[in-house]
């Protein structure tokens, strides 16, 4: 036999919000989905917490009533084979760079230390945009010293300009030889948007194959 990777069954409260509700974004089955499952450490997920992340095939979508509330059960299969074959993503565990929240300006805060050292083997970025009112670009910045002036764009770690008024999701691969400095943080460049609600994660490649 061989090992398999899957988030299993995700459960949520049924939400029929027109553009960003659970029903809208998860009711289509038998397709590959970008999945991020942040794990809060004794609290709601926050920057620096682990994230189970990857592209997985959605197997179903089931709405059930319990105690007067409606819940959705969403089973996922293994990591999408076509995704694994076309990208060099070797593990599903990353770190949360930005927990789901609305932002209205660029980031000048310090970042997180996700590994304790710089690396030189790239990685991949995963993002979810839940709401917004125009176009914007989300990026990851890195730094060797955890101070605002030291941060600069991590080459390749960008969504490109997106229309954030609709739900957006995706994965961005860095080159396999991309140097990644020790500290990481999110960055937001607003174009026509004045607010964007998003989540952002990064998986750093530590050694070849892991």
Positions of PLM-derived features:
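Surface-exposed ligand/attachment interfaces on beta-rich extracellular proteins
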Residues: 1, 17-20, 98-119, 130-139, ...
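Extracellular Ig-like/FN3 beta-sandwich strand-entry sites
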Residues: 5, 32-36, 120-122, 135, ...
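Short beta-strand and beta-hairpin "edge-sheet" elements
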Residues: 37-86, 178-179
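Surface-exposed beta-loop interaction hotspot
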Residues: 80-109
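A short beta-strand element within beta-rich, extracytoplasmic domains
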Residues: 119-131, 184-188
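C-terminal interaction-tip segments
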Residues: 189-210
